[in-house]
Amino acid sequence: SGAGGGGGGFITSLSGGSGGGSSSETAASLQPSTNYTITVGAGGAGAVYNTSGAIGASGQESSFNSLISKGGGGAKSYGGGGQSSGANNNKASGGGGSFLTSIDSLSSNPGTGTSASRGYGGGLGSTGSTNGAPYCGGGGGAGGAGGNGGGGSAGGAGGAGKESVITGVSTFFAGGGGYQSATGGGAIAPTSAGNGNSGTSGTGGGGSGANHSYSVGYGGG
C-alpha cells in the first residue's frame, strides 16, 4: 500500500487551538476599506505510479496578509521517508508517511511535524506483510499523527484533521492521507494498483495512498 501525504498546516484564532497541539493565534486586527492579500496554495502532485524511489510533491503554502501556512509534506515510496515540508519554517505542516520495502529493509523515517509546525508527523512503514508487499505509513494531520503501517492488512491511517467551526459548520481540516481513511484527510484509496486519491478540495487534507507498493499520496495545500 502506498504512503499517504501530510495535511496542510492549520492555523486559527478560534478556541481549540491550531494544528499540532499549538495554541490559537491572536486574532488579526483588520481595517475597513483595506485590501488584504489572500493566497490559497494548491496541493502537491502525487509521484508517478510504479516508479521506484518516487516522491510526491509537497503542497504549496497558503497565506493571509503576513500569516503563512506551508502545504502538506509529500510521501515517499520504496525505502525512503516522507517530506516534512518546510521543517525550518514555523508555519510548516505535518509530514508525509514513509514507505519501507521488505527487499532492502532500510530504516525509513516519515516526515516530521511539531506543535510549532502546526501539524503532526507521518507514520512509519512496515515490512509486516505476508505476501512481500510492504505496509506504508499514513500522513500526519493537524489533529493527530499518521498511523504506522502493518496494523491489520493494510497501510496506516492518515492522521486526524483539526475540527473547527470557522465556516459555521463543524468541519475537519488538514487531515493526513492514508490507505485507510481519516477525518479531514484523503478518501479511501483505490483497491487496485494505481495512484492514490487527492485530498478533499478546500480542507487542506493530504491525499490517500493506494493499494500498490509504488503509489504515494498527494501533499495537502
PLM feature spans:
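Low-complexity, glycine/proline-biased repetitive segments and flexible coils/loops
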Residues: S1-G221
